[in-house]
């Protein structure tokens, strides 16, 4: 079977793990959850740093652990790259020495590829003490890649960095899955990192899998509600760039074969695939098509579902799921007053309104 299969049972402290997980054979699979949910424990089991009481771990056709068959491949033979929260560089080696440390068979072409991908050339003769946090993490990622791993495990690699350093490293992480066709398992507690990087999402809570699947589906599921506040609820779209406005700094993206959206200008070629977030708070609903309005996006839709939500004991909001096409949906958040005034019900034809300026660069990621 292709991909990464993780199945194990284990008790660690107060957390009882019962994991059954199938992850894709390439791309970025994010593991998300609150502190103490067991995210790092899962990748430690995959790497062999932790041995479960029972279970099976397999990568494609390679069985790494099987408690029934008595298989437990040692850590150093699993051919796994691991990037920790802290870079763990050797202080007495310069960057080039750190990159080459542990490389079984030096490959000059691969070395040049990794150095170019992570923009490490200016750093090669410098020592870790002179590097910024972001530079150290880029070196750590490079070292892991140069071990020619069959899978890359990343344990919150940006958690120790401040915001400017995170912004420095994120573009390099975005290139990883395009440049190396290996599965990348990425542990994080950051919704922004998931938006920018992930193709697949697993939500974990106290050692149990709450949801796992394609990012756009899990993102809109009940499993994500505890982490999405009233203002953070949103819809994710896999879209592509269709048009650059000839006069204004706006880009039209296709959400489906017929539904499109004008957003702030995206500097990428026509046809580029992107991931795009539309916040439910930025979507309003009208029963008739407006005329002479400043809102650039007016999309005909059908009411698919109406849900009452309680972000706090004394607060209530209404989530409306709108069908733009048969398999393309958009969430809108409105007030109970608006619901009563519009008398919305399933099957109603309406118009969704989204400001062109509401979708910004932080809501968009190129997916190559």
UniProtKB/Swiss-Prot annotation:
Compartment(s) where it occurs, according to its Swiss-Prot or TrEMBL record: Cell inner membrane
Protein keywords: ATP-binding, Cell inner membrane, Cell membrane, Membrane, Molybdenum, Nucleotide-binding, Translocase, Transport
SUPFAM superfamilies, sorted: MOP-like (SSF50331), P-loop containing nucleoside triphosphate hydrolases (SSF52540)
Domain Mop: 292-363
Annotated binding of ATP, by residue: 33-40
EC number: 7.3.2.5
Topology versus the membrane: Peripheral membrane protein
GO molecular function: ABC-type molybdate transporter activity; ATP binding; ATP hydrolysis activity
Family of this protein: Belongs to the ABC transporter superfamily. Molybdate importer (TC 3.A.1.8) family.
Role summary: Part of the ABC transporter complex ModABC involved in molybdenum import. Responsible for energy coupling to the transport system.
Record-given protein name: Molybdenum import ATP-binding protein ModC
Gene symbol of the encoding locus: modC
């Amino acid at each position: 079977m292709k991909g990464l299969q993780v199945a194990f049972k284990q008790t660690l402290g107060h957390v009882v793990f019962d994991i059954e997980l199938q992850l894709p054979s390439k791309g970025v699979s994010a593991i998300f959850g609150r502190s103490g949910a067991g995210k790092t424990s899962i990748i430690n089991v995959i790497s062999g740093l932790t041995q479960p009481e029972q279970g099976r771990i397999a990568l494609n056709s390679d069985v790494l652990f099987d408690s029934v068959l008595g298989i437990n491949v040692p850590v150093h033979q699993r051919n796994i790259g691991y990037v920790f929260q802290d870079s763990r560089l050797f202080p007495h080696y310069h960057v080039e020495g750190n990159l080459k440390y542990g490389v079984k068979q030096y490959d000059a072409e691969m070395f040049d590829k990794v150095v170019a991908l992570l923009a490490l050339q200016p750093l090669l003769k410098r020592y870790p003490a002179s590097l910024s946090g972001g530079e150290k993490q880029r070196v750590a990622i490079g070292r892991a890649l140069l071990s020619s791993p069959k899978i890359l495990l990343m344990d919150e690699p940006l958690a120790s960095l401040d915001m400017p350093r995170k912004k420095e490293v994120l573009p390099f992480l975005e290139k990883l899955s395009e440049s190396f066709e290996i599965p990348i398992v990425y542990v994080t507690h950051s919704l922004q990192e998931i938006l920018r990087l992930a193709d697949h999402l697993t939500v974990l809570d106290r050692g149990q899998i709450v949801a796992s699947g394609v990012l756009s589906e899990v993102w809109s599921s009940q499993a994500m509600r505890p982490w999405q506040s009233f203002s953070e609820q949103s819809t994710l779209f896999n879209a592509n760039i269709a048009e650059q406005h000839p006069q204004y700094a706006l880009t039209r993206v296709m959400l489906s074969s017929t539904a499109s959206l004008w957003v702030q200008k995206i500097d990428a070629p026509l046809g580029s695939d992107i991931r795009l977030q539309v916040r439910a708070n930025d979507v309003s609903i009208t029963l008739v098509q407006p005329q002479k309005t400043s809102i650039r996006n007016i999309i005909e839709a059908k009411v698919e579902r109406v849900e009452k939500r309680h972000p706090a004991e004394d607060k209530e909001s209404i989530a409306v799921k709108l069908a733009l096409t048969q398999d393309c949906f958009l969430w809108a958040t409105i007030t109970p007053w608006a619901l009563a005034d519009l008398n919305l019900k399933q099957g109603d034809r309406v118009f969704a309104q989204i400001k062109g300026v509401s979708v910004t660069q932080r809501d968009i990621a190129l997916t190559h």
